[in-house]
Amino acid sequence: MGISLPFFYSDNGVLNKAARIATGDIAGNCHPYKAGLLEEEEICLMAGLDYVTPWTRDTSINAMHAMCFFDSNIVRNSLISVCCSKDGKNIAGGDYWDSIIWAMGAWQYLSLNDDAEFRAFAYDVIKNTLAKFEAEELDSDGLFMGGAVYGDGIAAYPDKYAKTENHGTNIMNWPAANPDKRSKKGFGVPMKTLSTNCVYYAAYIIAGKLAEQLGEDSSEYIAKAQKTKDAVNKNFWNEKTGRYDYLFDDTERCDHSEALGLSFAMLFGIADDAKCESIIKNTYVTDHGIPCVWPSFSRYRIGNDYGRHSGAVWPHAEGFWAVANLRKGNIAGFEKELFSLAHKAVRDLQFAEIYHPVTGEVYGGLQEKAKEGFFLWKSCQKQSWSATAFWAMIIYGIAGIEITDTSIIIKPYLPISVNHAELKNLTVGDAQISIKIDRDSDAPKTIEIPKNLKGKQSYNLSV
């Protein structure tokens, strides 16, 4: 039941310390756990020091960020533990609106591991989960209703969505308190959000690829993916702001910037090159990283406070934004997130859940209850997806790793203040890969390696 850990070393002390802190936070959150469809107690990755469960979205995002390069068995265990059986069918568990993000974590695992048993399991879960929410939440415009990815708190949403049953803080309490405004089908939250619909697009693409691998017809999923992509571009793109809107329903639209949604649109290929350039140009980034939603909704702008899910800086979103910026050629945008997060981690000796957008301090943001009013929520300690987000910047940024359907491309990049970097013990299936990167050496600048390697493999590269 050991844990496999990668290592990072460079000639930049801040990055080195931050990487060690991130690795420590991740390792400390790996615990024996049994839930969902996991039949026996196994090591799984908890969401953070203050959490006792993996959570579906956290598990998938951790896998997408970096955890598959740490220990793929822990990823596999965690993914199975957040699934459940409903009406005799295996589906992804968790909050209903973004539970399909499970598909992306499963695909990341399968992209690095030839696991026939899990491939069949994943296809079954994804197929059933898509069918369930197509029946319940898919609207006539080709978009899925429900909250934003990870936006469980009402601080993520406009004033309309702040009135909830029993004055609860969760968006799932909204339909019961607003029977005249709830959607006629599904759970009842009528909004459509950018991030969630981007994830559905990705899930359709993944379902199509798994169908092909398993010898089934993929055409239905490919067609649905294209329809979802077209619907996102038609309904969310805003020429006036130069980026995608955050959300809309039948009565109002919110054109705030959503970090995860914009990042997903760029990373998943929903946005073309012109749109990506426009998004980067027209998205506000604070001195301490991209805020989850900006601007913060005005009801939370009390003194120096911001909303928990609107205005605050969440590192798991920073990770996606940083990688998207680098892949689209915005080096400055990548380095801002990389070094900002690294300095805060070294300062605090941990990767916290959330930070203040102006001061950079560990900060949980304002939430609200009608009877209690506004109150400051805790920023949880040693958050797994904050730590894996930093490692994502190392793996996909500095190492420049890109996973294709057939191979792994390594095209490194070094920040201007870094001339040497090493990554050791990255897990890729049955292999442990080490990468040494030097500026202006005679080594190749890009290599492509197969996925079916075994044992220890070392590569030298130059930038």
Where in the sequence are the language-model features?
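Aromatic-rich carbohydrate-recognition surfaces in CAZymes
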Residues: T53-T59, A63-G168, M172, T193-Y201, ...
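Structural helix-adjacent loops and short alpha-helical linkers that scaffold large soluble proteins
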Residues: L5-A19, A66-L79, L110-K127, D141, ...
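Active-site neighborhood of glycoside hydrolase catalytic domains
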Residues: L194-F236
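Extended glycan-interaction surfaces of carbohydrate-active proteins
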Residues: L5-T53, N73-A92, D139-M191, K229-P315, ...
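A structural signal for alpha-helical segments
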Residues: S10, D50, N113-E117, F121, ...
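Non-catalytic C-terminal accessory modules of carbohydrate-active enzymes
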Residues: F320, A324-V463
